[in-house]
Amino acid sequence: MTRPAPNKTPAWTGRSVPLLSEEGFAEALERLEAKIVALEALAKTPPKGAAALGDLVRMADEARDLGVSLRTVCRARQSSNAADTLPGTWLSSVKRLSFRLEEASGGILSAVRELPDEVRARAPFEAWLSPLAVRGSQSSSLFEAVMLPLGSQQSHLVATMKLRIPSEDGHMISLSYAQATSVLKTSPDNRFRRSVFALFNAWFAEHSAAFADLLNAVRGWKLHEAHAAGRDFMTAAFEADRITPAAQLAMMKALELRRENARLTITERARLLGERQLHVTQILGSVEGMHASAPEGLNGLDEVCGSLSSAMACTDPAFGRYLEEALENHWIDARSMSQRAGGTWCEDLPAYNATAVFSTLPSGTAGAFQFAHPLGVGFMHKAQHGEQAPLKRLPYSVIEIFGQLAVTMLERHMARKLEGSTEADLLRWQLMRRASNMLLMVPSRHKLLVDLLAARRDGILSASRFNEASRRGTHFSAARPTDATSTSGAGNLISTAQTRSSTTGSTPSATWSRSISPRPF
């Protein structure tokens, strides 16, 4: 395969992210089921010999890698077209097969534990018994029946967003959910961003009843699941991310004690602009008025990739090779299309020795740093391809650190490059914007999620109750240093993030990993 032309928007192909077609996916799904049927039969009476049992372990690992890859394909297709209903059906089938696979793997694991100590300490058995090993999906059929349709409904709801707004030249343009969120995160046009924000909030207010129903259903399910297992609703999240309750409480307390210092990331940015306060859309938005474009080293795809490779060289020289491979093999899709879902992510394709990166083309300083995050995650996934399946499944709390590391290293690289230049304030804005997100917005969203779960135990919550909780969360993080007349409209925006994380199973790990990732200051 060949590298895309200079600064040409990278896009997935049928070879880079396989099975996007119905025929290809159906064939791979049949292959996965055939492997699982064989494993189920053999797991009933596992072989006693180490050689035969080792073959069975490797067979299960191959099936797990294929299952993970098929999940990634489902997400890739859904992200490419949020209105597509097929990925939800596909994902349901993959998860049902994955549940059967883990059931069969349990029988194989029991046989592995009966091997002599010296045999268990060798490959391929050692990985299955490692304290770092993570078992696959244990979701029940009831979970699949409830949660998957709710997740699909949320995707289809946001896919209907079409915001009509005048452009700079006076023509009316239509923005999808993905395009609107991109404007809010990366556009340096303050007027345009505020206009989109107002329409964005109005759209969610108009659909608030539907999203409230979704949130009530998801939160209600999580409480039911915890109660049925005889556990607190946070226990499963802590276990999945290998975080102890004591560590989580200590982290949140430390963030709370330093909240006033963290708020300086907002007040100092207001001072940079010569303003008394920041509008709510400026807290996580790009800077306006300092520079129309990104500084040298962050202009366009090629410059961003070059800077990121240089920045990561001291951490691991292999990162540059991964980035080159990702571009040459079309593992990155950064197209801007109205039907695309919002967000930026990277998932693994271990069965195909590849990764899938979904992002937007880096435009401006904020877009460049946003682009770095999924590439850091992708590098971590690719580095794990030599490991057995149980060791590839790192918890989100660990995976997120690799994304944050890539952003941090790029920030440090650009700080050295721009030191003493007229563009230094642009980077300073980026550093404080990111700190505002990590130290204020993410913890407040985590607090919001926990508060809503606690409130949901008392009954169904109204849309107004959700928005009131969102407004409290916004004021908890940044009320005083922002435009108070504007933060009252932030509730619907934060509720949007709450809806998205609710349907994807949010955990405390986002707060944890962002708080302990290396900081450039």
Predicted segments — roles?
Residues 169-186, 232-235, 288, 296-385:
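Active-site-adjacent "gating/activation" loops or surface patches in catalytic cores
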Residues 268, 272-310, 320, 355-356, ...:
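Long, K/E/R/D-enriched contiguous segments that form extended
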Residues 378, 398-412, 511:
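An active-site-proximal "capping" alpha-helix that borders the catalytic cofactor pocket
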